[in-house]
Amino acid sequence: LQVLTEEVGSIDSPVGEHQQPGGESMRLPEHFRFKRXSHLSLCRWCCNCCHNKGXGFCCKF
């Protein structure tokens, strides 16, 4: 269990560093991947129709 925890920590650290400087550009691919793996209705780009703007969810669909 300790080995797995260390590996996950080492993987999370570089990803977190890449997401911070990338900002929104790094978040778009995450929404694409989440849409493919999820059965929820998601937009590729948020239409800003919700109170959670930028959440990726589209209230109209």
Curated annotation (Swiss-Prot):
Residue ranges of the propeptide:
1-34
* Compartments in which it is found: Secreted
Name the GO cellular-component terms: extracellular region
The residue ranges crossing the membrane are none
**Biological processes, Gene Ontology terms:** defense response to bacterium; intracellular iron ion homeostasis; negative regulation of cell population proliferation
Q: Name one Pfam family in it.
A: Hepcidin
**Positions of the UniProt region annotated as Disordered:** 1-24
Q: Which UniProt keywords apply?
A: Antibiotic, Antimicrobial, Cleavage on pair of basic residues, Disulfide bond, Hormone, Secreted
Read off the InterPro entries from this record: Hepcidin
Highest taxon of source: Eukaryota
One GO MF term: hormone activity
Cystine residue pairs: C43-C59, C46-C49, C47-X55, C50-C58
Family according to the record: Belongs to the hepcidin family.
Q: In UniProt terms, what function does this protein have?
A: Seems to act as a signaling molecule involved in the maintenance of iron homeostasis. Seems to be required in conjunction with HFE to regulate both intestinal iron absorption and iron storage in macrophages. May also have antimicrobial activity.
Q: What is this protein called?
A: Hepcidin
Per the record, the gene is: hamp
